[in-house]
Structure formats: structure tokens, C-alpha cells
Amino acid sequence: MTVKSPDIQSLVEGLGHARVALAGDVMLDRFVYGHVERISPEAPIPVLRVDEERAMPGGAGNVARNLAALGAEVTFLSAVGDDEAGADLKAALEREGGIEAALTVVPGRTTTQKTRFVAMSQQILRADRETTQPLDAASAERLLAALTSALKDRQVLVLSDYGKGVLTPAFARGAIAAARAAGIPVIVDPKGRDYSLYAGASVVTPNRKELGEATGAAVDTDEEIVAAARALMKAHDIGAVVVTRAQAGMSVITADGAVTHLKAEAREVFDVSGAGDTVVSTLAAALGTGLTLAEAAGLANSAAGIVVGKVGTAVVHQDELLAKLRERELSMLEAKVAGLKSAEDIVAGWRARGLTVGFTNGCFDLLHPGHVTLLERSRALCDRLVVGLNSDASVSRLKGPERPVQPDIARATVLAALASVDLVVIFEEDTPEALIKALRPDILVKGGDYTIDKIVGADFVQAHGGRVEIVDIVPGFSTTGTLARLKG
């Protein structure tokens, strides 16, 4: 997803307006942190000297935490046992803030706990206490009634299935039916092989392994993943599949045939605990505020890249996501400024996809409305617009020794920030003729009162089947005039 400032801040802050209903398997995540200095004399195992212990809501509880961290309003429904872990979970959720938790207490049920022992940022052991028994019918009915009531003022429903028995077949199907009746999209983080439980869901978010298990198909390549996802959608009336692929990123496949592959954005991976929770929560908040699935997946991919760089069952806050998106935008701006060889490769790729390539050029020293209008009108004539930019030496030869005011890298960065510009190439010559011959644009655009025979490169473009367009410029704006007024 491409987001331009200042839209980034309003987009991220907009996640705080999402109203989400969440149901699923809650569990207590305990982390025992320490260090290892020796091997036990009793057995060939490390001895962990404990320094710190932490406990926090996990499973669907971590989805709730992530939603709250993004600023969303969350109604969370689940079931716990009448045990110490259940009481600890209720207290932990109350401390979180922003989560309206409705936990059904089921006598005799074991609350799931996962205890991870960690030394030097590495897990050395995990110990589980859990039940996978389906919730009894009476408790499931109470939970479904509470969820149906909660949907009245929610924008999206999330079902977080960890296979611990809360999402019984009857509950899952009833929840999806209630949401569809209310016109609310349903996102499912699935578990197991039987996706008939999720029939009618808007989006399911399996990881690559889960997708393979659910379909019995190979899922090693992009093509195999797309084929498996399409089979899943067709079999169970699912609207879209978002496949999380660890270091390979994410794939988004929709029932209307659209496919998007997103590269992973993590720089360092310390712990993947709960990364899927971050993905589903970001998707939910984004869809709840009206973003498209492709846009929501882009945000979720960025959020996942943040959370795997943390230790433990972690969350992503609004300010972290905002910083990540701004960092990515700067990287994208840099990527839009290319040398000649890179530009040739990029243009060849566009042309292979059947895209029309346009070209215009100039000094663009102090960007003004005339420049902006020229670029917008040029971009309207093509699918991709390349801007040839005179280098500092070239500008000095053309405009005089006091020009340019801004160096070429600064001018290129400003141009790259415009949505109308797809690529900027700096050239050293006085004219862009060599650049035009190298890139062979389909459309050559010039602003002003030129005639075609006076436009550099026009004959070459026309000889190769292209066309030349002259667009009107906005009168009253020029860099030279602006500088003259400043000198007064």
C-alpha cells in the first residue's frame, strides 16, 4: 500500500475509530526470563536462573490487546475456567484499558496457560496447561447471545480460533450468520483442517502451513499458494484469504481474482509469538474504518514487521506504526530516484506489463503550481510518468552560475514525493535527448507554446511509434520570476 504524507497520520489515527467485536480462545501467556550459566548435574539440561516473570493475555486475548494498542474500541467475548489462571486473565484484561471483556466462567474448565522460559532472547522451553474440549452447549449459547447483542454497534467481527474449544461449530456458524445478517464483515484467524466452520467469512488468515493442511495442497510457491487459496474460497464461500508467510511476507487473494504479494518488512526477528494476532487485529481495525482489503493488508504487513522485532507476546501501538509507515515512505521516495541503468530496467518492466510510459523534463528548481499542473496533466496521459531532471551542472550552463537554488538530489526528492511522478532520472547533458533515446517513452510531453519540431526528442519518439503531447501551462509562475522578486 502506498500512503502519502500528510495522509499517513490521519490514516493511522483513524484506526482509533474502529469498533470491533472479538470472540475466541483466550489464554494466559506467562514468560519466565533468566540466564543460563551452567548445565544441571542431574541431567544434560540447562539451568535457568530466573530474573523476571511476566503474565499477559494471549491467544484471542492478544488480538484484543493489539486492537486496543491501535486505539480501537474492543468488545471481547471468551470463556475461562473457575481457576487461578482464569482470575489472573480477567484481572490482566481489566488492566489493559480499552477492552470491554465479557468472559464466561465455566466451572471445572481448565484455563489454558502457556509458560515460556527465555534466556538471552531465546525460548528454551514451553510448558502448556490446557483443554481442547469444546465448550458445553449452554455456555456456547450464552456466549453467542452476548455476541449477537454486541454486534449492534460494531463495524467488524473477528473470530480468533486457537483450537481450545470456545469456537464450537455451532458458535462459529452462528456468529458468522449473525454478522452477515447485520452487514458486518467477518475476519477469521483459523485453526485445524475443517474450514466449513468458517463458511461465509469475509476473510480468513491462515499461515502457509495451515493453508496447506486445510487444502492438502502444496503451498511452496506463489502460484501454489494462490491455487490453494482459491480452492478454499470456492469450497467454503469465503470472500478472501490473507496468507501469512513468515520471512516471505503475505499474500492476499480475493474471490474476484485479485492477487497481491507483499514482501516482509521486518529488519530483525526476535520472536514470532503472536505475530498472527497483530496481523488479524490490524486488518480488523483497518477494515472497520473503511479501508480496502489491499490497503488493510499493507498496514497489517507493516505492523507484523514491527512486532516480530519484539520479545514475547507483544503489541504494536499507533505511534510505532506511524513511524514505520513514514520510514517506508522515505525509502519509497529514494526508490523513485534512479540512475539510467536502473531506469531502463524499471521502464522495461512497465512495458512488459502493457503499461504506457510517458516522459517530460525540466529543471524544477523551485517547485511551483505551474510545475505541479504540468506533471499532473502529463501523468493523466499515461500509466507511468518518468521525469528527466537536469543536473546541477546542466542547470548552471542553461540558467547561469547562480542556479540551481536547490541541488539535484533535493529537487529529485521533492519530485518523487508527488503522486503524479513515478520515476525521476537526473541527466548531465543540456538536453534530455540521450535519456529519451535510452528509455524510448510512448508519450513525450512538453508544456508551453512549443511546436513539435522544436521539442527535443520528438522526432525519435514519433519514429518509434510514440506520440508527442503539448499541454497548457499555468501562466504567472516561474522560478526565475520568483527569484527576481526575492532579490527585490
From Swiss-Prot:
The active site is at 277. Residues 359-488 are annotated as: Cytidylyltransferase. One of its GO terms (molecular function) is heptose-1-phosphate adenylyltransferase activity. GO terms for biological process: ADP-L-glycero-beta-D-manno-heptose biosynthetic process. The keyword Kinase applies. Transmembrane segments: none annotated. Residues 1-332 are annotated as: Ribokinase. Pathway: Nucleotide-sugar biosynthesis; ADP-L-glycero-beta-D-manno-heptose biosynthesis; ADP-L-glycero-beta-D-manno-heptose from D-glycero-beta-D-manno-heptose 7-phosphate: step 1/4; Nucleotide-sugar biosynthesis; ADP-L-glycero-beta-D-manno-heptose biosynthesis; ADP-L-glycero-beta-D-manno-heptose from D-glycero-beta-D-manno-heptose 7-phosphate: step 3/4. In the N-terminal section; belongs to the carbohydrate kinase PfkB family. In the C-terminal section; belongs to the cytidylyltransferase family. Catalyzes the ADP transfer from ATP to D-glycero-beta-D-manno-heptose 1-phosphate, yielding ADP-D-glycero-beta-D-manno-heptose. Homodimer. This is Bifunctional protein HldE. The gene is hldE.
